[in-house]
Amino acid sequence: MSFDGMFTYGMTHELNEKIMGGRITKIHQPYKHDVIFHIRAKGKNQKLLLSAHPSYSRVHITAQAYENPSEPPMFCMLLRKHIEGGFIEKIEQAGLDRIMIFHIKSRNEIGDETVRKLYVEIMGRHSNIILTDAAENVIIDGLKHLSPSMNSYRTVLPGQDYKLPPAQDKISPLEASEDDILRHLSFQEGRLDKQIVDHFSGVSPLFAKEAVHRAGLANKVTLPKALLALFAEVKEHRFIPNITTVNGKEYFYLLELTHLKGEARRFDSLSELLDRFYFGKAERDRVKQQAQDLERFVVNERKKNANKIKKLEKTLEYSENAKEFQLYGELLTANLYMLKKGDKQAEVINYYDEESPTITIPLNPNKTPSENAQAYFTKYQKAKNSVAVVEEQIRLAQEEIEYFDQLIQQLSSASPRDISEIREELVEGKYLRPKQQKGQKKQKPHNPVLETYESTSGLTILVGKNNRQNEYLTTRVAARDDIWLHTKDIPGSHVVIRSSEPDEQTIMEAATIAAYFSKAKDSSSVPVDYTKIRHVKKPNGAKPGFVTYDSQHTVFVTPDADTVIKLKKS
C-alpha cells in the first residue's frame, strides 16, 4: 500500500501549494469512478484527478488526456451544480487517514455564498467521493451510496449526516517521541515492521519495512532513531518521490525505499510520480472489462484458423501423393493381362525406376483391374486439382491469423473509444453481428480520433491505435511526403511524422512510440521501418489497416513509457 496516510499527508501539502485558491472552471466524469476538475490556479490551468477506483484510488494533478462521455453522469451534474465556478479555500487531511477534504466556496442559483466540503476517501474497494454542506455537515450526495444494511456504523446517502470512518486508536507519527516508540514496541517478540503498522497511524508496511531496514540491527537505540528520522522527513516535507522497480514490479513512495534492491527513478512531484505510475493501468483495467467478450472472440477465431491450417496441411500431404497415384494407374494399365477381379494387391515391376524394383499396389477386390487403374487415375486428378485449392486456403487462413494477431495487439493498448472502433470493424467485416438495441438510432459514421504527440523539436507525430485509425491516418490524413513508421514484421500501430524531412531525434522518438504501441512493447532493440507515405500502398481487397511498403530505412529502439508520456499532447 504505497498511497498510505503518510503519502496522503504529502499529497495534501503538494495540492495546497499548487491549487489552493484556484477556481474550478470545469468538471468532468470520464469514467464511473473518476472525476476531473479543471482548475485555474497560480496563473495556469491544471487538471485534478479524483479517483474512487477500487484498485487505483488516488488524488493528484494530471497531465493525461481523458475522454468524456457524450452525456455526463448524474454525480457529475450534481458536482457542476454545487461547486463548478467555486474556489478551493484549502485542502486538509482527516488526521493521518487516507481521507482528503476540499473546502470549496461557491454561490448557489440565487447568488448566495455557500461552502461545500468534498471528502475523497482513498480506501481501496471502499473508496468514495462525497459532497457535503459544510455548515450543516449533511451529505448532498456521494459517488457510491452506503445504506444502513450495508454498514451499521455510517450511512452515505443524501440528507444523512456525514460521519468519518471509525478512527483507529493509534499514535500520530508526526507527534511521536522516542518514549512513545519504546513504550509500544516489543523487541523480544513479533515482527517489528508489523508492530509499527499496528501502533502508528498512517503507516503502511512499505514505510515500516523501510524504517526497520534503516535501523540496521534493529534495537532500542537504532529503531527509534530511524523511525523519528523518517517521521521528520515527512513532517518537514522533505519528499523524494520515486518509483523503484524490482524484478519487473514497480513500487512508488514519497520517501527513498532503500530496503528495495532495484532501479529507482525520481520525480519532481508526487503528482508527476502518480501520473507515471498509473499511466495506462486504470484504463487497461477498464478496457479489459469492456472488451472481455471481444478479446475472447478474437482469440477463438485465431485458434480456429490455426486448427484449420493443421487440417489443411494434412490434406496437402495427401494431395502431394498425386504422383504416386498416377504411377499406380499407369503400372496397372501396363499389367492388366496378368491381373483379375478379386485380387487384393498387384506385384508389378516399376519400369520408371532405373533399378526396376517390384512394388506392391493395393487393389479393391470388388473392381476389375481396369476399374482399379481408373480409380487411381481419378485419385491422381483430384489430388492434383486440390493442391492449388488447399494452398490458397492455407494462405487465406494465415492472413486471418495475422489479422487477429493485429487485433490482439491493438486490444492490449486500446482505450474505451478504440474498443468501440474495433467492434465496429468486426461488424463491418461480417465477423460480428451489430449490437444495436431496439429503438436505438444508427450512429452516423465519424472520422477516427488519432492520438497526437509532439517531438522534442516541435514536430507533430500522429498514431493509429486500431485498424480504422491506421487506415484513416495512412490513406487520408498523411501527406505524400510525410514520414510513415511501423515495427518491422511485427503487429503494431501506424505512426506518421507530419514532415518530409524530420530531424534524427524526431525519427527516433516516433520509432519509440511505434515500438511502444506494438506486440514488441516489452522487448528491447525493436526494429522499426520508416519511409515516405508515397511508398506505402494498400493492396486491392486488403483488410483495414493492411499495407505494403518499400524504400524503407530501419532503426532499432527500445520501447519506453516515459518517452511516450513526455511527448503526448494532453
From Swiss-Prot:
It holds the Pfam family NFACT-R_1. Residues 1-173 are annotated as: NFACT-N domain. Residues 279-336, 368-430 form a coiled coil. Disruption phenotype: Not essential in rich media; synthetic growth defects are seen in double rqcH-ssrA mutants, further exacerbated by translational inhibitors spectinomycin and erythromycin or at elevated temperatures. Decreased accumulation of a stalled reporter protein. Double rqcH-rqcP deletion strains grow normally in rich media. Triple rqcH-clpP-ssrA mutants cannot be generated. No change in sensitivity to erythromycin; double mutSB-rqcH and triple mutSB-rqcH-ssrA deletion strains are hypersensitive to erythromycin. Loss of Ala tailing. One of its GO terms (molecular function) is rRNA binding. Residues 446-570 are annotated as: NFACT-R. InterPro entries: NFACT_RNA-bd, RQC_Subunit_NEMF, RqcH_bacterial. Residues 282-434 are annotated as: Coiled-coil-M (CCM). The keyword Oxidoreductase does not apply. GO terms for cellular component: RQC complex. Changing D97Y: No longer binds tRNA(Ala) anticodon (UGC), has minor Ala tailing ability, decreased accumulation of a stalled reporter protein. Keywords: Coiled coil, Protein biosynthesis, RNA-binding, rRNA-binding, tRNA-binding. GO terms for biological process: rescue of stalled ribosome. The keyword Coiled coil applies. Residues 179-281 are annotated as: HhH domain. Belongs to the NEMF family. Key component of the ribosome quality control system (RQC), a ribosome-associated complex that mediates the extraction of incompletely synthesized nascent chains from stalled ribosomes and their subsequent degradation. RqcH recruits Ala-charged tRNA, and with RqcP directs the elongation of stalled nascent chains on 50S ribosomal subunits, leading to non-templated C-terminal alanine extensions (Ala tail). The Ala tail promotes nascent chain degradation. RqcH, RqcP and charged tRNA(Ala) are necessary and sufficient to add an Ala tail to a model stalled nascent peptide; does not add Val. Associates with isolated or stalled 50S ribosomal subunits. Binds to RqcP. Interacts with ribosomal protein uL11. Displaced from the 50S subunit by thiostrepton. In crystallized 50S subunits RqcH is variously associated with A/P-site tRNA, P-site tRNA and RqcP, an E-site tRNA or A- and P-site tRNAs and RqcP2(YlmH). HAMAP family: RqcH_B. Activity of this protein is best tested in a clpP or ssrA deletion mutant; ssrA (tmRNA) encodes the SsrA tag added to nascent proteins in stalled ribosomes by trans-translation, which targets the nascent protein for degradation. Has 4 domains; N-terminal NFACT-N, central helix-hairpin-helix (HhH), 2 coiled coil domains with a beta-hairpin in the middle (CC-M), and C-terminal NFACT-R. The NFACT-N domain contacts 23S rRNA, the A/P-site tRNA anticodon and recognizes tRNA(Ala), while the M beta hairpin binds protein uL11 near the base of the bL12 stalk. This is Rqc2 homolog RqcH. The gene is rqcH.
